[in-house]
């Protein structure tokens, strides 16, 4: 259960970073 949650969080973070790099705008 925790492993799935961690994987999900990692996926979201990775996709968020990709969007940040793609749009050249990073909220973080």
Swiss-Prot record:
Disulfide bonds, paired cysteine numbers: 20-26
Presence of keyword Signal: yes
PTM remark: May be N-glycosylated at Asn-22. Activity with this modification has not be tested.
GO MF entries: toxin activity
Subcellular localization(s) per the UniProt record: Secreted; Nematocyst
Miscellaneous information on this protein: The 26-Cys-Pro-27 bond exists only in the trans-isomerization.
Subunit composition and interactions: Monomer in solution.
Function (record text): Probable toxin expected to be employed in prey capture and/or defense against predators (based on its abundance in tentacles). Has only a weak affinity for lipid membranes. Shows moderate cytotoxic activity against breast cancer cell lines (MCF-7 and MDA-MB-231).
Protein name from the UniProt record: U-actitoxin-Ate1
Origin species: Actinia tenebrosa
